[in-house]
Amino acid sequence: MPTINQLVRKPRKSKVEKSKSPALNVGYNSRKKVQTNVSSPQKRGVATRVGTMTPKKPNSALRKFARVRLSNLIEVTAYIPGIGHNLQEHSVVLLRGGRVKDLPGVRYHIVRGALDTAGVNDRKQGRSKYGTKRPKG
């Protein structure tokens, strides 16, 4: 326990909160080829690999993911939500934050219905989260 005198000389440091989606907090100046300190809610990127991975221990499935090179030249792993997708290598995708609890290292979600990513077909409820248009009739 420090004395009052020690605290007067060197006060306590406040904790710095770490971002849960750090790649969204980095911009890129392509003219100077330097990373900048600009945050954004979403980022555009190009899928470099599309595949499936298995979740952590109590769960069992084949979760769809894409490895994405962002516009700030950072490469991250992102989850593809919904049933079925049309993504391939070189597809342009929009990324948002949000981790997947049972996939280690996956801290981002791909936004369905934006850029090259199609919305989920035949979805009636929760359509806005999956980029699905309102059904006719």
From Swiss-Prot:
Database matches in SUPFAM superfamilies: Nucleic acid-binding proteins (SSF50249)
A single Gene Ontology CC term: small ribosomal subunit
Function: With S4 and S5 plays an important role in translational accuracy. Interacts with and stabilizes bases of the 16S rRNA that are involved in tRNA selection in the A site and with the mRNA backbone. Located at the interface of the 30S and 50S subunits, it traverses the body of the 30S subunit contacting proteins on the other side and probably holding the rRNA structure together. The combined cluster of proteins S8, S12 and S17 appears to hold together the shoulder and platform of the 30S subunit.
Family statement drawn from the similarity comment of this UniProt entry: Belongs to the universal ribosomal protein uS12 family.
MF terms in GO: rRNA binding; structural constituent of ribosome; tRNA binding
Subunit architecture: Part of the 30S ribosomal subunit. Contacts proteins S8 and S17. May interact with IF1 in the 30S initiation complex.
CDD domains, A to Z: Ribosomal_S12 (cd03368)
UniProt source species: Streptococcus suis (strain 98HAH33)
Keyword flag GTP-binding: no
GO terms, biological process: translation
Annotated protein name in UniProt: Small ribosomal subunit protein uS12
Disordered: annotated span: 1-57
Keywords: Methylation, Ribonucleoprotein, Ribosomal protein, RNA-binding, rRNA-binding, tRNA-binding
Modified residues (3-methylthioaspartic acid): D102
